[in-house]
Amino acid sequence: MMAEDRRARVRALLDAVRAEGRTALTAPEGKVLADAYGIAVPGEELARDVDEAVACAARFGGPVVMKIVSPDILHKTDAGGVVVGVEGAADVRAAFCRIVANARAYDASARIEGVQVQELLPRGQEVIVGAVTDPTFGKVVAFGLGGVLVEVLKDVTFRLAPVDADEALSMLDSIRAAEVLRGVRGQAGVDRWAVAEQIRRVSELVADFPEIAEVDLNPVIATPEGAVAADIRVILAAGAPKERRRYTREEILTSMRRLMQPSSVAVIGASGEPGKIGNSVMRNLVDGGFAGEIHPVNPKADDILGRKAYKSVTDVPGEVDVAVFAIPARFVAAALEEVGRKRIPNAVLIPSGFAETGEQALQDEIVAVAERHGIRLLGPNIYGYYSTWQDLCATFCTPYDVKGGVALTSQSGGIGMAILGFARTTKTGVSAIVGLGNKSDLDEDDLLTWFGEDPHTECIAMHLEDLKDGRSFVEAARATVPKKPVVVLKAGRTAAGAKAAGSHTGALAGDDAVYDDILRQAGVIRAPGLNEMLEYARALPVLPTPKGDNVVIITGAGGSGVLLSDAVTDNGLSLMEIPPDLDRGFRAFIPPFGAAGNPVDITGGEPPTTYEATIRLGLEDPRIHALVLGYWHTIVTPPMVFAELTARVVAEFRERGVEKPVVASLAGDVEVEEACQYLFERGVVAYPYTTEKPVAVLGAKYRWARAAGLLGGGS
């Protein structure tokens, strides 16, 4: 069927259903959609009475499945409206009567159109293919193990719809039971292409018709010969969602450039009185060394911190790039009108007292003012922002000026301050720290678009509680990930789960499950916690990009080697199978009671020369792509001796063009802390008292390299 013809056919059907005031399609109506989009379903007919049911069953010539058809009964099994394996005229008659009686008992007011008589499919692997409308990401397609246990097993994966054939196939390998589909215990695998086609076509259907809220094919019977949907359920949305205003990439970059690289900043509510937010913002801007113009705005002052104060922002001479608000929430809308008349493109709203306290109307008002004047809003309810390469500290919190390549954002002020403390403690250089707060306008996809192009930014780490527009974020992430890593800490992993849903797919699509799969699809590295997000952010720019999958562990302690091996496996990395010649090479440097293999156990009492020789061999051999070092504190090789020799050898090889990621776990007394800091500052990611953290960082680097297309195997 031609694309235009099938869309016209489906459009006519959906309009008719809407005209009747219904949101659920009947099974025969679902078959119309399936046929239009090439979704394989069994032969079936609608029987309006007993005699028609007998005739239908006779035409199929074998056992049949019989199902109630009612626009008012969504879950047919719950209503006793499904009978499987019916054969013979007498049984068909009895089943028809029983199904109708059960349906009337279930819902006496239900409209009953008849009974669907469907050919019985052969036994096979039951899977579910579906689609839901996610509040964050829009149309999302789902795949997993199906049948009656689908909501118990919850072995399901999600992708943004529509998907192409390759993405659909990748979903088959993304569930825990992936091997079942390939065939286990002598059973043949399923026709993977046929299953993937069901996924692709469902995704195409919901992308073409936004009013379709949910689609369920459950179960799909998958066999070596094909994949057929035994049941199809379609639910329509009650109303169209509100469209969010979208900005072009060029518009975002133009606005963000003036926000992050301003020449002139006005502080509305600036104060000369210590303890006031307006004073703290002014003090940070002035003391931070910002080279641009700083204009305090306060109708009651003539001079603030040596700067001329203005009664209104409209009195400020020349262009202004950013207006920072440090006034109570109730005065923001009026002041924002003046910002609009001044044609200032960006407003940074520090005040709280908006939607986060229930004052949604007040927030809606400032958004309307901003949209009318073309102002982009950062906030409200934020600590401000730092743009270190501009010496810009527009915040009422403690200043920070250590320049570097890490851009950090947070939706929460408390998390923002944790970011600041971590950066200071670890001496992490940052390109920016930005608070997002209520995200009335500017959000993560705007910042991601900017940081993706910012030459000062090498890694982006974002704390978020939600995304206003998941598709825009994914679009920005896909454009950024090939150039630099994006790390996300998504809060609310254990939030409530699925709301009441009309389909199995809807019940399975809990917020976090969808976030997890789609962030991975976008190439984003998801951090399990705040510390991991911060450690990934500071460590990923330090590590060179691996050129292959072979990881070798060199350790001075067997126990650490076992734990490091576990961590390698847990992080999806590959321990190299050591070939005989390399095994002989390592054995030449370690005592007879040591162990080559992988891990290479040099034992704890070895001198610095053994560490150096084995590390050199690991860096020299081109078959090895990454090193994990396990150090055990001994007087023979003190921590700083180990750190200095490791840093020296790694630097020597990098000067020769051999750049491999090297991470280290240091076990010992407190001296290992200084040794780790020394190594970190010299390009070896090292942590004391943990075997998990250095390998987790290496795993994150590998995930990014795959997502960026620098290694095979996907993300």
Give, region by region, the residue ranges found by the protein language model.
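Catalytic-core regions of core metabolic enzymes
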Residues: 1-715
